[in-house]
Amino acid sequence: MFNALDVDRWVAERRSSLDEAKVSVAGIIQAVREGGDGALLAMARKHEPEVTSVRVTEDEVEAAYGEVDDRLLESLIEAEARITRFHELQKERSLWLEEVEPGIVLGVKTTPLDRVGLYVPGRRAAYPSTALMNAVPAKVAGVPEMCACTPPPILPLTLVALDIAGVDEVYRIGGAQAVAAMALGTESIRPVQKI
């Protein structure tokens, strides 16, 4: 049974871990801010030593299709269509106004951003569905530019899902450095308005 001392100890342990994470992430953000693409490339090479660029090429995306089973490809296409339909229904309700009192009108209007960034987990937590669930709503909302970051090595299925979902740029970057790159921008990654 948990008592007050156990709770205090548990909170103190978590606070210590959080403080360590803050220091680590601050260092990563600073490295991306100062080192740009070079810092990103160095971090990516820890997981994929032969990487020469953080940007995934169109040839790599095309090659990924050849590595994905036809049934899986059909499943991704079907999932994209279903997710699209769901979010189209939401979009139909993206503007509403209601007069709550005479002369007082409340409402909501949804307006797409110009450029968004998506973080798609990888390695042991690689779920290509995350690519669809993040990119399709943005596409349906009318966001004209999407970039995605996913840690190396990237599963072919993830690349195919990102392509099916309409993502314009894919970068082999994971973790805090991916979020920093999308937020701050680098020599080759233009900053986004929302991640």
What would you call each of these model-derived segments?
Residues R82, F86-R93, Y119-G122, A141, ...:
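Mid-sequence acidic-hydrophobic segments that form the walls
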